[in-house]
From Swiss-Prot:
It catalyses: Co-sirohydrochlorin + 2 H(+) = sirohydrochlorin + Co(2+); Ni-sirohydrochlorin + 2 H(+) = sirohydrochlorin + Ni(2+). This is Sirohydrochlorin cobaltochelatase. The gene is cbiX. Signal peptide: none annotated. GO terms for biological process: anaerobic cobalamin biosynthetic process; methanogenesis. It comes from Methanocaldococcus jannaschii (strain ATCC 43067 / DSM 2661 / JAL-1 / JCM 10045 / NBRC 100440) (Methanococcus jannaschii). Keywords: Cobalamin biosynthesis, Cobalt, Lyase, Metal-binding, Methanogenesis, Nickel. HAMAP family: CbiX (MF_00785). Co(2+) binds at residues 9, 75. Substrate binds at residues 45, 70-75. Pathway: Cofactor biosynthesis; adenosylcobalamin biosynthesis; cob(II)yrinate a,c-diamide from sirohydrochlorin (anaerobic route): step 1/10.
Amino acid sequence: MEALVLVGHGSRLPYSKELLVKLAEKVKERNLFPIVEIGLMEFSEPTIPQAVKKAIEQGAKRIIVVPVFLAHGIHTTRDIPRLLGLIEDNHEHHHEHSHHHHHHHHHEHEKLEIPEDVEIIYREPIGADDRIVDIIIDRAFGR
């Protein structure tokens, strides 16, 4: 069985999670994936490991993870793949950048055990899609 996990940044304010919940509901309504979960990078739950675990508990063997970010950044290229167990978790990054940021990542050390028979497919972020251009133009015209 296939699952889709939408991954967002998370925020101290509720809007980020509410948006992801709404998007997940809209995706569910299309009936393309039997399981749709959301996971948040930081500040709120469900965390990314919690979302993946929830999908596995429902019988998912193939988990497609879509980062709901416009562009690649440190979260999509490093933090999320690390949380998904796709890249080695070495702790040298704590020295890479000033520590004012990384104390927010209270989810970072949550360990995710992926069973042997479960495949994780990590996809690209939203990107410079023409459909985004349409939305930008609508917003510019106050629509």
